[in-house]
């Protein structure tokens, strides 16, 4: 079966990690043609250009895999074959009002076009239920997968990391990726008077007095492992939350907003849900006094291995090819 996988994102996000893993697994049995119409250094004003590029996608495949954007343009492009939608999350409530209005219209178009898809893939029970409740059928839940062995660390490696970035002497609280929508501003305001190392990571998209580290993946994992608490206080409905899952695999307690599919992950691993920033300081104190919460998280997170992910995707391909 020949597969065409339409991509829009250029930057690496949690969903790109998931997508690349699925592609690598399917490519072991099927030809996978990746078609990327994304724009480097994408800005919201360029979205019409992305949609225009999507409309020009053409070709015949046995199966096309599409995200939200490619479902929008599905009736207008020049493709032939069956279609699978992979939807991580849908929430534009954090956007400026004008964008919310525009995306509200596009969402209605999306839901109408989605009925033409042969299958829908989601990554959490929250989003599976979301589509089923709207009357969609053939909705599949295929969870994230992680290489658990890559989350092994020795004490010397951790100590070196702390010394390198001067993160010793007091507990580390990881606030999250340095984006406003990740809740780092509100989290910092709640915790800034505590005797803690407050750390963000990734490109600094908001100015905070907290330390910001732009790290490669291994050092990012060392940050999660070194932290006493990891926060995932996203302000939008997540598909899952890769950072929370990675922190749990590091055995580090997690406090999250629980929005969208994140709640299933946090509650499954008996982590702490904080749905109001006013209570965050109290929750951090609780996590600092109960580090054993991290081991409960690990026990749950370690169940999401590669074998189940591989079997789920290959089973779906078999169903669609029959």
Task: Show the residue positions of the predicted features.
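A charged, aromatic-enriched C-terminal amphipathic alpha-helix characteristic of glycosyltransferases
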Residues: 17, 21, 288-319
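Carbohydrate-associated surface elements
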Residues: 126, 145
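Conserved acidic donor-binding segment of nucleotide-sugar-dependent glycosyltransferases
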Residues: 268-278, 285-291
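Acidic anion/phosphate-binding donor-loop and adjacent secondary structure
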Residues: 146-163, 168
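Membrane-proximal helix-turn-helix segments that form the acceptor-binding/catalytic region
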Residues: 101-120
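Acidic donor-binding loop of glycosyltransferase active sites
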Residues: 225-239, 252
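Conserved donor-binding/catalytic core segment of Leloir-type glycosyltransferases
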Residues: 166-182, 188-193
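Active-site proximal beta-strand in glycosyltransferases
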Residues: 63-65, 76-97, 121
